A protein has these predicted regions:
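N-terminal pre-ligand scaffold of iron-sulfur
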Residues: 1-83, 113-139, 143
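C-terminal catalytic domain of Rieske-type non-heme iron oxygenases
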Residues: 37-38, 62, 135, 141-448
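Glycine-rich loop(s) and the adjacent beta-strand/alpha-helix scaffold that form part
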Residues: 100-117
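Beta-strand residues in well-ordered beta-sheet regions across diverse protein folds
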Residues: 56, 66, 90, 105, ...
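Histidine-centered divalent metal-coordination motifs
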Residues: 72, 92, 184
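Short cysteine/histidine-rich zinc-coordinating motifs and their immediately flanking basic loops
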Residues: 81-86, 100-104
Length: 448
C-alpha cells in the first residue's frame, strides 16, 4: 500500500515530475533500428515520458530526435522533408540537423539568414544506436552520461535478436511490477496439468512442481535490487529463480535457455508503456530465425498488430487487447490453461494490469486500496527505492549510482538448483555476474 502522494510521485513521468525527472537522467530505448531503414527515410513520430518527438535518420545515417514542433511557429516537423543533412519543416522550410542546429530559414532575406539561424535552435535529444535499437537521452546534461553497459548492449550484433515490443495500455509501474511478482506465475501463467500439451496459440503454461507458493528473498543494491523466488522441487532440492530490477525501469527475468535478456518498461505517458524485450546469447550468434523457431511468431498467433495511426501509442499494439478481452478462449481455459488468454508475450499480464484504474479512469491504480502480502516483498522494495531516489534527486540533486557508474548494470538473472537451506546469495554470486562468452546459468528451466 502507498499513500496517495507517493503513488502520484512514483507513477507520473511528465517533465517536471519527480519520477519523470529521475527517468530523464538515463538513456531510454525508443524504437528499433529497422524503423529507419535508410538514410533520409521518412521520419517517425514518437512519444517518451509525455514528450512528443520526431525521430529521423539523416543523410549520413545518424539518428536524431527533435521535439515534434518547429521553433518557428509550432508546426509539426513530422511532415517535413528529411534530406541533405537535416529535417526541413513543411510549413516555412526552416531546416534543422540532428543537434537542433538551424541550417536554413528560407523565409528570411538571404543576407541575414546566417545571423538569424545562429539564434534559432530546435530542442534536440542525443541518440545512440546499438544492437538493433535506438536509445534517446532526454535529460538536462549538455554531455549525456555514459551509455548503459547492459550485457545485451555489449554483445556482437549477430548475437542479439531483433527486439520484441508490445504496447501496454497502463501506467509503466503496474506493468513492470508483474516482473517483480513471481507468485503470479503459479496462477495466471499456469497450465492446468503437469502433462498439459502446448496450446495451438502461445507457449505452454508454467508448472510449479510441488504447488507450494514461492518464498521471496530480496536484496537491495546500488543499481536496484535482485531477488530469489524459491520453490521446492520434487527431489527435495530448492529451485531459485533469481531475477533483477535495474533503475529506472528495467528487469531481467530468467527463462532458462542460456540466453541473456533485458526487459524495458518504457513510459510513453502516464497511461501507456512499451515493453521492449531484448534477447541475446553470450557465446554464439543468435539469429531471428532461431528465435522464431524457439518461440514461434507469437504475436501473429493472436492476430498480429493493429494498423498504426499517427499516434505513437498505437505502435506495437496487438489486435488482441482489452477491447476484445485479449483473445480469451474458453475452450483453452477449460482444457489446457488456468486462464483462457494465450500465453503470448505479456498478453496475460496485460489483462490483469490494464484494467486496474483509479477513480479518474486512468490506468494507474489507486494503491491506497491495496493489501500486500509476503509474496509482494520485491514490489515493496522497488517502490521504496524509486520513491527515495526520485525524492533525493528533487531535494538534493543526487542521482542514482548507475547513471554514471554503468558497470553496475553488468548483471544477469539465473535459474538455479540448490540443496535445502543453502546460502543462495553466496552460491549464485558468479551466476549473477556478466562473464563474457559464457551462457547464463540455467540449471533449471522455466518448466513450461
Amino acid at each position: 500500500m502507498l499513500s496517495a502522494e507517493n503513488n502520484e510521485l512514483v507513477c507520473r513521468v511528465g517533465r517536471g515530475t519527480p519520477m519523470g525527472d529521475l527517468m530523464r537522467q538515463y538513456w531510454i530505448p525508443a524504437l528499433p533500428s529497422d524503423e529507419f531503414p535508410t538514410p533520409d527515410c521518412p521520419p517517425k513520430r514518437m512519444m517518451l515520458l509525455g514528450e512528443r518527438l520526431v525521430m529521423f535518420r539523416d543523410s549520413q545515417g545518424r539518428m536524431g530526435a527533435l521535439e515534434e514542433f518547429c521553433p518557428h511557429r509550432g508546426a509539426s516537423l513530422y511532415f517535413g522533408r528529411n534530406e541533405e543533412g537535416g529535417l526541413r519543416c513543411a510549413y516555412h522550410g526552416w531546416k534543422f540537423d540532428i543537434t537542433g542546429k538551424c541550417l536554413d530559414t528560407p523565409t528570411e532575406q538571404p543576407e541575414r539568414r546566417e545571423k538569424f539561424c545562429a539564434n534559432i535552435k530546435a530542442r534536440a535529444y542525443p541518440c545512440h544506436e546499438v544492437n538493433h535499437m535506438v536509445w534517446v537521452y532526454l535529460g538536462p546534461r549538455d554531455a549525456p552520461p555514459p551509455f548503459p553497459a547492459f550485457e545485451i548492449n555489449t554483445l556482437p550484433p549477430d548475437h542479439v535478436a531483433h527486439p520484441r515490443i508490445m504496447m501496454e495500455e497502463a501506467n509503466w509501474l503496474q506493468n513492470m511490477e508483474g516482473d517483480l511478482d513471481s507468485a503470479h506465475l503459479d496462477w495466471v501463467h499456469r497450465r492446468l496439468h503437469e502433462d498439459s500439451p502446448k496450446p495451438e496459440k502461445g507457449i505452454r503454461g508454467f508448472w510449479n512442481p510441488t504447488g507450494r507458493p514461492p518464498v521471496l528473498d530480496v536484496v537491495p543494491t546500488d543499481y536496484g535490487a535482485y531477488y530469489s523466488a524459491k520453490r521446492m522441487l520434487k527431489d527435495g532440492n530448492e529451485w531459485h529463480r533469481v531475477n533483477q530490477f535495474i533503475f529506472p525501469f528495467h528487469t531481467m527475468i530468467t527463462v532458462g535457455d542460456g540466453t541473456v535478456n533485458l526487459r524495458s518498461f518504457v513510459p510513453l505517458d502516464d497511461d501507456h508503456a512499451m515493453l521492449i524485450s531484448h534477447a541475446g546469447h553470450p557465446a554464439r550468434p543468435l539469429s531471428n530465425s532461431e528465435v522464431m523457431e524457439q518461440y514461434g511468431d507469437l504475436f501473429q498467433q493472436v492476430g498480429g498488430f493493429i494498423e498504426r495511426t499517427n499516434d505513437p501509442r498505437t505502435y506495437f499494439m496487438t489486435k488482441a487487447n482489452k477491447r476484445n478481452d485479449y483473445g480469451r478462449d474458453m475452450k483453452l481455459q477449460s482444457e489446457l490453461m488456468f486462464v483462457g488468454i494465450p500465453f503470448v508475450g505479456n498478453l496475460q499480464d496485460r489483462a490483469m494490469t490494464e484494467l486496474m484504474t483509479n477513480d479518474a479512469g486512468e490506468a494507474m491504480y489507486d494503491r491506497t486500496k491495496e493489501h500486500l502480502s509476503a509474496s509482494d516483498a520485491m514490489i515493496v522494495t522497488v517502490r521504496r527505492q524509486l520513491i527515495n531516489a526520485a525524492a533525493k534527486l528533487r531535494d538534493e540533486g543526487t542521482v542514482p549510482p548507475n547513471v554514471d557508474n554503468v558497470e553496475l548494470d553488468r548483471v544477469r538473472c539465473a535459474s538455479l538448483r540448490y540443496p535445502p537451506n543453502a546460502d543462495w546469495k553466496a552460491l549464485s554470486e558468479t551466476a549473477r555476474r556478466v562473464i563474457p562468452g559464457q551462457p547464463s546459468a540455467a540449471e533449471v528451466g522455466l518448466i513450461i
